[in-house]
Every structure is written in structure tokens, then in C-alpha cells.
Curated annotation (Swiss-Prot):
Regulation: induction: Part of the probable 18 gene mamAB operon.
Annotated Pfam families: DAGK_cat
This protein's UniProt keywords: ATP-binding, Cytoplasm, Kinase, Lipid biosynthesis, Lipid metabolism, Nucleotide-binding, Phospholipid biosynthesis, Phospholipid metabolism, Transferase
InterPro entries: ATP-NAD_kinase_N, Diacylglycerol_kinase_cat_dom, NAD/diacylglycerol_kinase_sf
Protein name: Putative lipid kinase MamU
Location(s), subcellular: Cytoplasm
Species of provenance: Paramagnetospirillum magneticum (strain ATCC 700264 / AMB-1) (Magnetospirillum magneticum)
Stretches assigned to the DAGKc domain: 1-131
Family: Belongs to the diacylglycerol/lipid kinase family.
Positions bound to ATP: G68, D69, G70, S71, L72, S73, R74
Length: 297
């Protein structure tokens, strides 16, 4: 197998070990296992350019992204339809995708596992023209993420970031007032929390956000009940206990597609942990089996 690995050189693990050392280790492991590997260190827009180049190379069989969930998510627009398999080296903060597919968190073990992994058809979510592997959120959660990331960029710890996010929510946040349209569904909502996941979430550790499966061809839709600070606090406590499927503070359902018409023209949206403003209205779809994901045996 010919591997093109694109590594985010700003990822914490890479910075600690030294980027050239990481590249040399990965290349040596894959070569020793009989594969041809080209490892590229990049950051920012250069990562996108390197991924696009690898996806257009007819000799490449697999593209492996070393970074967090956001780096992986941004690669999807290049990988989907390219005929390449996609793998992940978990070098980010939460690493939800790596957890979901059983990729080891140790760098060397992850490289070995991916060398022998099986390309497995995997569903993708899509909101407008943006793919996602995990979830897309509107309401309080994107505002929490934005405040958290600002604190982290200023040198704060993970805990500092979380506290900054909670402080920001305590000062107030925008409600999502919207009309929902789906198969046999039409409703108006006013909520602090709105999430659409790639397949349904199961009750588990909240820091894993584990889905029941990744080939169920459905979107999971989760809407917080109520719109005030107390309802948001109740929801947060339930989620902190790992309750998604049994969370009484959530209305949940599964749909193949959903349209959302919000009063805000460009609300904040969190897509696989990355926050951006997106033009409303929103169209969510599930794309069954479009991504060949490298899944360890």
C-alpha cells in the first residue's frame, strides 16, 4: 500500500516529540511493514494543499491525517470521491473519530494498526456543502467552543478553556429559533442546544461521544428541551453523566434528512469541533457508505 500521511505539525503530540522525529518514526514503521510512505509536515492552509495533492495522486492508496477531529473533518472535501481510503493518527484533544474506530492513542501503535487496517464503508453527514464525521451543533455549544478555544490560544490549559467556555455561557447566549422540516416532520423550536450527529449516539462516556454504528444510514437529531439557563444546566448535567439515548432533557430522533430555517442569517455552527459562521437555511443529509475509512482489525 502506498500511504500519503499529512501531519499537523502544530498538534501537541508532534510538538512535544519534534516534527522531524515524528515523520521519521512513522516512515520507518510503515516501511518496515512493507508499505511505501511519504510523510508531509504541514499546518494551516498548507495541510489542505497537501491533502488535495495526495488525493489527486493516482499512485496513492490511503491518505492518513495526523491531527485532531477538526483536521480530519476539513480533509473530507478532498477525500470523498477520490477513491482513497482515509485514516487518522489521533494527535488532537478529544479524538472522537479515533475512539470510535478503535485507533490506539499511542503514535507507534496507531501507525502499526493503520498499516493493517481494512477500508470500511462509512457514512458521512453533510450540512449544506460541508461534510462531517461526528456532529454539527447550533446554539450554546458553538459559543462554548469559541470561548474555550480563545482561552486555549492565549496559553490556557484544557481546564482554563472549559471554565472560559462556561463563563461565556453564564453571561448569556443566543437561542436557536427555527422551523424544522423533515420526512413527516414540521415543527418550530426555541432551544439552547441543537445537535445533528452522524448516526445515533449511545449512552456512554460523554468524552467519547460514541455512536451506535457508523453505517446506519441515519442522522441523529438532538434538541434541548426549554430555552433558559436552568434547562441548559439540566442538559449539561445529563450529558456529563454520559446520557444521550436516555437523556430526559433532550428530544431525540433519527431522520435521513432535515431542513432548518433559522431567524439568524449566519449563526455560529460547530462542525466536528470547529466553529464557523454558516449561511442559513441549513440542509442536513446522511450519505451512506461514501467514505472508505481505515479501521484497525
Amino acid at each position: 500500500m502506498r500511504i500519503a500521511a499529512i501531519i499537523n505539525e502544530r498538534a501537541g503530540t508532534v510538538a512535544c516529540l519534534s516534527p522531524p522525529v515524528v515523520a521519521a518514526r512513522l516512515s520507518a514503521i510503515w516501511t518496515s511493514l512493507g508499505h511505501q510512505a511519504h510523510v508531509t509536515l504541514a499546518e494551516g492552509k498548507d495541510m489542505g494543499r497537501a491533502i488535495r495533492k495526495a488525493c489527486r495522486d493516482p499512485a496513492v492508496h490511503a491518505v492518513i491525517i495526523g491531527g485532531g477531529d477538526g483536521s480530519l473533518s476539513r480533509s473530507l472535501k478532498h477525500v470523498v470521491g477520490s477513491g482513497k481510503s482515509l485514516g487518522v493518527l489521533p494527535l488532537g484533544t478529544m479524538n472522537y473519530v479515533a475512539r470510535q474506530f478503535g485507533v490506539p492513542f499511542d503514535l507507534d501503535r496507531a501507525a502499526v494498526a493503520l498499516a493493517d487496517a481494512v477500508p470500511t464503508p462509512t457514512d458521512l453527514g453533510r450540512v449544506n456543502d460541508r461534510f462531517f464525521l461526528i456532529r454539527a451543533c447550533l446554539g450554546a455549544f458553538p459559543e462554548f467552543i469559541r470561548s474555550r478555544d480563545e482561552a486555549r490560544r492565549k496559553g490556557g490549559s484544557f481546564l482554563d478553556g472549559a471554565l472560559a467556555g462556561l463563563t461565556g455561557l453564564a453571561r448569556g447566549h443566543r437561542l436557536i429559533e427555527a422551523e424544522l422540516i423533515g420526512p413527516d416532520v414540521q415543527a418550530r423550536i426555541a432551544t439552547s442546544f441543537f445537535m445533528v450527529s452522524n448516526n445515533m449516539c449511545r449512552d456512554s462516556d460523554p468524552f467519547q461521544l460514541e455512536r451506535e454504528r457508523m453505517d446506519g444510514a441515519t442522522l441523529g437529531v438532538y434538541i434541548g428541551q426549554g430555552a433558559g439557563p436552568f434547562s441548559l444546566m439540566d442538559l449539561g448535567l445529563q450529558v456529563a453523566m454520559g446520557r444521550w439515548a436516555s437523556n430526559e432533557a433532550l428530544i431525540r430522533g433519527s431522520l435521513p434528512w432535515l431542513e432548518i430555517r433559522t431567524r439568524q442569517r449566519k449563526p455560529l455552527v460547530s462542525i466536528d469541533g470547529e466553529v464557523e459562521k454558516m449561511e442559513a437555511p441549513f440542509r442536513f443529509d446522511i450519505l451512506p457508505g461514501v467514505l472508505p475509512m481505515l479501521v484497525p482489525k
